[in-house]
UniProtKB/Swiss-Prot annotation:
Sorted UniProt keywords: 4Fe-4S, Cytoplasm, FAD, Flavoprotein, Iron, Iron-sulfur, Metal-binding, NAD, Oxidoreductase
Organism whose genome encodes this protein: Acetobacterium woodii (strain ATCC 29683 / DSM 1030 / JCM 2381 / KCTC 1655 / WB1)
Protein name: Caffeyl-CoA reductase-Etf complex subunit CarE
UniProt binding sites for FAD: 335-363
Family: Belongs to the ETF alpha-subunit/FixB family.
Enzyme class per UniProt: oxidoreductase
Predominant location category: cytoplasm
Listed Gene3D superfamilies: 3.30.70.20, HUPs, TPP-binding domain
The protein's Enzyme Commission number: 1.3.1.108
Catalytic activity from the UniProt record: hydrocaffeoyl-CoA + 2 reduced [2Fe-2S]-[ferredoxin] + 2 NAD(+) = (E)-caffeoyl-CoA + 2 oxidized [2Fe-2S]-[ferredoxin] + 2 NADH
Quaternary structure, from the entry: Part of the homotrimeric caffeyl-CoA reductase-Etf complex composed of (R)-2-hydroxyisocaproyl-CoA dehydratase CarC, and the electron transfer flavoprotein (ETF) alpha (CarE) and beta (CarD) subunits.
Subcellular location: Cytoplasm
Length: 396
């Protein structure tokens, strides 16, 4: 593709030159000239008043959208264990499938993973597309994307959902490019438009300060990655059965360009905040980064982990992996302690579905108390030691 200027139409108005974000356009002898810095962004095409600029080599792909049916969930597994986010996607996928009157399917890749299909059926899948091959034992972008791309081309799903995990965030954009469709990343809400039956994908934007709803009107499949912990887990029914469709998982030399030499698991003793049943979270009300040591004492007593707010991450007090909120991780622990956290809407969105929320704050008017099940107005440096003392008394 290249940007071309039709000299006979160009009037040398310089609007394209002023609009170019890469300074790639000059005006020579009253004619626009496109330089090597051009990235084909197309901004100049939109502003040209005489339609003297066009993009060569582009053909609009017109798809028969009626050919695409079914909601697919990428059934991510690691070492023979299905990731928890898959069950959340099956729950949400079933709702979407019911609204548009189609079936819910899972696509499973791996080596010797056929026995996992029963678990996918139990969580609501009507069909499972299975690719089982030694080359798929460990995740590679080339291997997984080849198989799923071929399956999408053959079976034409209407919607494909992925967990916003490390693997999902790598695989989904690769497939979106391969099948020439759009992708909405890190969605926190999915719904079907009642009028046109397209999926409305909502995700945080501009640092979580607003929520953007995105649609994919002309391309299929519609693709989304969804954050773990956002959607409700599907109901489990072991009596549910379905159809297994085996995919061709044949690879030629050179299809997979990378080789996994070793998987080094984290050596940290901390529990992931997305998996923890008990979370003790601290905000700027701690007053100092050393305050997290006190929170860790309480978390250790409960067998939980420490989390934080975005403000503490921005201040360099804590790591982003510990951040709860729209721009961090969404969590659903049994108990969530909010210590010195004021309760910004972005943070609340990431923890409001916790079973029990306990807020500790000096400011009795802090917004966090509006969502808390129990609120303690006081100095956290006095309250938390008192809680630890009581836990010691009961043998915790």
């Amino acid at each position: 593709m290249a940007i071309k200027v039709i000299e006979e139409k160009c009037i040398g108005c310089s609007k394209c030159q002023k609009s170019c974000p890469f300074d790639a356009i000059t005006i020579e002898n009253k004619i626009a000239v496109i330089g090597d810095a051009c990235t084909n962004c197309g901004t100049c095409i939109d502003v040209c008043p005489t339609e003297a600029i066009l993009q060569e080599g582009t053909e609009k792909i017109v798809r028969d959208l009626s050919m695409y049916k079914g909601v697919w969930v990428f059934a991510e597994q690691r070492e023979g264990k299905i990731m928890p986010v898959v069950f959340e996607l099956l729950g949400e996928g079933k709702k979407l499938a019911n609204e548009i009157g189609t079936e819910l399917c899972a696509i499973l890749c791996g080596s010797n993973v056929a026995e996992l299909t029963d678990e996918l059926f139990a969580y609501g899948a009507d069909k499972v597309y299975l690719a089982d091959a030694p080359e798929l034992e460990k995740y590679t972008t080339d291997g997984y994307s080849k198989i799923i791309n071929e399956a999408i081309g053959l079976y034409k799903p209407e919607i494909v959902l992925y967990g916003a995990t490390h693997i999902g965030r790598d695989l989904a954009p690769c497939l979106a490019v391969k099948v020439n469709t759009g992708l909405t990343a890190d969605c926190t809400k999915l719904e079907i438009d009642p009028d046109d039956k397209k999926i409305r994908q909502t995700r945080p934007a501009f640092g979580g300060n607003l929520m953007a709803t995105i649609v994919c009107p002309g391309s299929r499949p519609q693709m989304s990655t969804v954050r773990p912990g956002v959607m409700d887990k599907a109901a489990y029914d072991p009596s549910q059965k379905g159809e297994v469709i085996k995919l061709d998982a044949t690879f030629n030399e050179g299809d997979i360009r990378t080789k996994v030499l070793e998987i080094v698991k984290t050596t940290t003793d901390n529990i992931s905040i997305s998996d923890a049943d008990f979370i003790v979270s601290g905000g700027m009300g701690l007053g100092k980064p050393e305050g997290f040591e006190l929170l860790k004492q309480l978390a250790d007593k409960l067998g939980g982990t420490v989390a934080t707010s975005r403000a503490c991450v921005d201040a360099g007090w804590a790591d982003h992996a510990q951040q709860v909120g729209q721009t961090g991780t969404t969590v659903k622990p049994q108990i969530y302690f909010a210590c010195g956290i004021s309760g910004a809407i972005q943070h609340i969105a990431g923890m409001q579905d916790s079973d029990i929320i306990i807020a500790i704050n000096k400011n009795e008017n802090a917004p966090i108390f509006e969502v808390a099940d129990y609120g303690i107005v006081g100095d956290l440096y006095k309250v938390i030691p008192a809680i630890i003392e009581e836990l010691d008394k009961i043998g915790k």
